[in-house]
Amino acid sequence: DRLSSLTPTIPLLSEESDAIDYSLRKSWQRYWLIDPLDGTKEFINRNGEFTVNIALIENGQSVAGVVHVPVTGISYFGGIGIGAWKQNINQLDNEVQLIVSQAMQENSGVRIVASRRHLGEQLDALVEKIENHFGKATLLSMGSSLKMCLLAEGSADIYPRMAPTCEWDTAAAHGILCAAGGEIVDLQFRPLR
């Protein structure tokens, strides 16, 4: 309700709200996309890896996002043209600007982050290909949109998504990742929109 009152002319779409058919909203030039609880299984399992996601979508592209981790008080936020940041609510004077990791150094290995819910043969095959090409590969399993936040802060190099996903699960972190200098691509390495 507060976001709607702050920006009354911008529609709001949430995973938890009534469904708005794509045929109606595809003409929206700008809207808020919210996932009030990303990582439901992580929330149920009380592992701390669930988030609140808010994205601003313009012309079909995530241009700004906020990913908040309630358990730790850490927020990731950013947008196109303003950069990306990480901040702990308990240390408001200690913002950290996010920049994706630089090109991997030879023999440094690849840091792969993956969903603990979607590990399997496809991921194993990809990890093997990466190891054959780059050498060492380190796999970190994590829940929710935190995986893309690790990319944005430079703590991981790649996040292969092998299972279906919904726009509210990725939009906020996508905006942050792009603001930090990263990108999400499809299997043909085209930027995802």
Which sequence ranges carry the predicted segments?
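N-terminal subdomain of lithium-sensitive/metallo-dependent phosphomonoesterases centered on the IMPase/IPPase/PAP
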Residues: 1-37, 125-128, 132
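Residue-level signal for inorganic ion chemistry
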Residues: 3, 12, 40, 69, ...
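Conserved acidic residues
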Residues: 29-31, 63, 110, 157
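Glycine/serine-rich anion-binding loops at beta->alpha junctions
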Residues: 32-49
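Acidic beta-strand-loop-alpha-helix segment within the catalytic core
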Residues: 54-148, 192-193
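Oxyanion/phosphate-interacting regions
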Residues: 125-133, 140, 146-193
